[in-house]
């Protein structure tokens, strides 16, 4: 549901053409091709729904079933997408969350995140963190006296996957209690703030 303001474009970033194809279509094709994906929902900026449907027809994205409006933040947009699925999917169904602006959907990563979510109830793609992380000294923000060993860090991104029942509960709970929904919060950080244990899947 992002608008691409950081990229200085009038057109939303996911609709920018790359080799005569919008970025969002490259993303959707990764899900369209995957045999374990049954249906696709896109949370989209108002005014671009018809454009997305037209592109989906043009590029044969037959698994696209729902296009709904986003919110003012990323978390509001995901919430809208989750709530729209109430009554449409079962509690044990696996919901994969992915950023439309990330077009390189690796099939093996998608397979692993789905498999781990089926076993554990959730899964987040992860990679080892190779940079050095230092903690800012609260007494002098230009200095540091502490670092975090990178061996205990993981860098996570999308796709992420959750069983729908838990995901739906989490978004109701988070927005009612205003937990894990502000700033740079995402589904994974929200889940941790709600006390859930997350499971790592393979990244790329």
List the model feature ranges, each with a label.
Residues 57-93:
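Short phosphate-binding loop-to-helix
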Residues 18, 43, 68-69, 98:
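Structural motif
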Residues 1-50:
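N-terminal glycine-rich phosphate-binding loop and ensuing alpha1 helix
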